[in-house]
Amino acid sequence: PTDIGAGHRGASMGPEALRVAGLAEALRERGLEVVDTGNLVGPFNPWLPPTEGYRHLEQVVAWNQLVMDAMYAQLQLGRLPILLGGDHCLGVGSITAVARWCRENGKTLRVLWLDAHADFNTSDVTPSGNIHGMPVSCLCGLGPRPLTHLGGASPALRPSEIRQVGIRSVDQGEKRLIKEYGLDVYDMRYIDEIGMKHAMAEALEGIDANTHVHVSFDVDFLDPA
């Protein structure tokens, strides 16, 4: 667990908090087999200022490589991996792994990005340099090569493969990029108008039995950060 891509401490405590809260037991009570493979161990957070628009790029790449390898290994075993972060920069590694597995197995991919933020910043428009605000842009091929090519192929995702739900905070530079790349965004204004049920029905429209659905969930989707 890590907060390497964030600007504040705390996200690294997420996995242990969920364990203590009884996540595994709750899943087992629903008849699921749960295997806790333990924590990944990566570089410490040096808490340095941004360099060329990115904070801790080297460490972020290392963590996402670990995540990608771990996720892909579980998919290869036929399991459904659940990654407990950690800040949302780890979405680069997890979704890159899923996208690779889908390509190799002839599956279409639909990513549901449940978040208060669009996370589509780049080094040119980011107000902070924190890479937890950039995972979606990196997955779509915008960003430093070590992240955009983490799985070898770039982009890992096409904009048409992702639906962003619950968005309520978008930086000015992001708005232009989101419009340029044609992302499907279901922001809170739209959800307030039509309701979450209808918004999710739209976000899931077009999936079939050959579609692998991946959910990437940020806790501020429920409560503003």
Describe the residue ranges of each PLM region.
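Conserved alpha-helical scaffold segments that buttress catalytic/binding sites
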Residues: 1-225
